[in-house]
Amino acid sequence: ELIQGSPALALSVIREANRQARSGMSEPAENLEVAITRLGLKRTEELLARLPTLPQLEIPPALRQLQLISQHASQQANGFFASRLARLWQDIHWGSLLFLSPLWPMALTSPQLLEEWERRVIHKGESARKVELQLFGVRLLEICQALVDLWRLPIWVEQGYRLLLNEQRELVKVLRI
C-alpha cells in the first residue's frame, strides 16, 4: 500500500527489477506486482530501506507537481478505461502513472531548468525546440525516451514517447477527430 501511494517508490522498485532482468534479457516488469515478485519481498524491503527520504516540504515544488500530475493522470485513465478494459487495468494504471517519471530526476536535482522551460514555453510562447536546445542541449522528449529505454519502463510509456517524437502529424490528426 505504501508503494502504491508513492509514484517514486513504485518507479524505484520497477527500475530495480528491470535492471536485474536486463542481464537475463527477460521481459521488463510492466507493473509493481511483477517487479516485487521478481525482486522478492526481502530485496524489495532492502531497496526501500536504502532509498533516501525527504520531508514533504523539502521536496522541490516541480517534483511534487509532476508527481501529482502523474497520480491524476492515473486516476483519470482508470476512470475512463479501467471498467471497459478490465484486463488491461494494470497496464493503464502504471503506464499513465509512470509516463512523466523520466522528468522526476530533473525536477529533483535541477528544478530551475524545468521552471525556466515552463516560463518560456508555456507562459511566453517561445518555441519548445529552441528553448530545450538552449537549456538541455537536446529535446526534452529525447531525454525522456532515453530514460524510458534505460529503465525499461512499460511498453505503453515507451510507445507514448515514440508517438510524441516520431508521429506528431498523426497525433494531430487523431486529436482533431
Over which residues does each language-model region extend?
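Post-HEXXH active-site segment of zinc metalloproteases
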Residues: 111-123
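Conserved alpha-helical "signature site"
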Residues: 1-114, 128-152, 157-177
